[in-house]
Amino acid sequence: MKIYFATGNPNKIKEANIILKDLKDVEIEQIKISYPEIQGTLEEVAEFGAKWVYNILKKPVIVEDSGFFVEALNGFPGTYSKFVQETIGNEGILKLLEGKDNRNAYFKTVIGYCDENGVRLFKGIVKGRVSEEIRSKGYGFAYDSIFIPEEEERTFAEMTTEEKSQISHRKKAFEEFKKFLLDRI
């Protein structure tokens, strides 16, 4: 079974393939197709995107939307994570948190899967905190260099993709997706 992953981000494909590697009958293939990103919750964006891409391809497709939510900033950047990363970046988030004791944050991923039977959503959350500074060993992307997951001292960007894939929000969402696929194959 081939499932197309509509994303321009090769890191997401790599992470998905690591998580789903033991499903021998499932092949995830990247398709670089852009779809309109509506303003809404992660769930609304994933559902809309999956339907939109499926209506073009007429083949099983997944889209994924993630957000980075910082408690002390009332959930900002949240659903605007990509835009905020491209504008103020990690430096801007750290600046907004200056003088704040509460550094709790979480990543949330929603995968939208669409086939001839409609859309299904799969969610994953990983809680943690925002580091005091940017910390990276060259791994990861976006907010990974400022996010320390619970029960860790390293940021996601200080972990290899394989290490991050064991605990990430994307892994949790893909594990839910994997359970769904196992029931179908």
Swiss-Prot record:
Question: Temperature note from the UniProt entry?
Answer: Optimum temperature is 80 degrees Celsius. At low temperature (30 degrees Celsius), shows about 5-fold decrease in activity compared to the maximum activity at 80 degrees Celsius. Is highly thermostable. The half-life of the protein at 95 degrees Celsius is about 200 minutes.
Top-level division of the source organism's lineage: Archaea
Q: What class of enzyme is it?
A: hydrolase
Q: Answer whether the UniProt record assigns the keyword Transcription to this protein.
A: no
Cellular component per GO, a single term: cytoplasm
Annotated Pfam families = Ham1p_like
Question: Which EC numbers does the record give?
Answer: 3.6.1.66
Ligand binding (Mg(2+)): E37, D65
Q: Which GO terms describe its biological process?
A: nucleoside triphosphate catabolic process; nucleotide metabolic process; purine nucleoside triphosphate catabolic process
Reaction(s) catalysed by this chain, per the record, are: XTP + H2O = XMP + diphosphate + H(+); dITP + H2O = dIMP + diphosphate + H(+); ITP + H2O = IMP + diphosphate + H(+)
**Keywords in UniProt for this one?**
Hydrolase, Magnesium, Metal-binding, Nucleotide metabolism, Nucleotide-binding
Q: Which SUPFAM superfamilies match?
A: ITPase-like (SSF52972)
- Give binding positions for substrate: T7, G8, N9, P10, N11, K12, S66, F141, A142, Y143, D144, K164, H169, R170
- Give the pH dependence of activity as annotated: Optimum pH is 10.5 with dITP as substrate. The reaction rates under neutral conditions are <30% of maximum.
Provide the cofactor list for this protein: Mg(2+)
Assembly state and interactors?
Homodimer.
What role is this protein assigned? Pyrophosphatase that catalyzes the hydrolysis of nucleoside triphosphates to their monophosphate derivatives, with a high preference for the non-canonical purine nucleotides xanthosine triphosphate (XTP), deoxyinosine triphosphate (dITP) and ITP. Probably functions as a house-cleaning enzyme that removes non-canonical purine nucleotides from the nucleotide pool, thus preventing their incorporation into DNA/RNA and avoiding chromosomal lesions.
> What family, per the record?
Belongs to the HAM1 NTPase family.
Q: Which HAMAP family match?
A: Non_canon_purine_NTPase
Q: What is this protein called?
A: dITP/XTP pyrophosphatase
Q: Which organism is it from?
A: Methanocaldococcus jannaschii (strain ATCC 43067 / DSM 2661 / JAL-1 / JCM 10045 / NBRC 100440) (Methanococcus jannaschii)
Q: What is the lineage of its organism?
A: Archaea, Methanobacteriati, Methanobacteriota, Methanomada group, Methanococci
